[in-house]
């Protein structure tokens, strides 16, 4: 940030007027995310609509067991359902949290399920920078390393720890994906009145500031 012209005081970064917008100008207004099946490629941005499954629920519900923690078997079933749906363009990412798989390898199993059980585009892991790199490496096996470096094959979700905080885990994952030409969604995790002002106007102002900072950082 300092090299780009921002005022950095400890962990606080202040962006001068216009810096964020100048950096954001270097990002494309739309891009194509490539799928294993080229017919399933999606264009993100512009006036395009891309529908994907829900992201991150720890619980599932079925007719026999009711509400319970999700398993890897549940995850695979949701990936299959997403693949079968004509209404969904995208396979998503963490369609549920498979709690029966250790956290340090869970991302590998989830990504493999998306790759094997669907030919739609998918999202990478963001729960640790090394897991983001694992996602890039797995895509290198699926698509070819050169193809991954020249094309977008993942769109991953980066959460901002509102108010106005980017933690090292999410920023590390963002840096990995940006360095490998992969796209990210910058999403502030905000509840009005808790991590943001009570008013709608105040909350939206904070959302805009956090998103501008996150997108600008990804373009550094």
List the model feature ranges, each with a label.
Residues 66-220:
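Helix-rich catalytic cores of soluble enzyme domains
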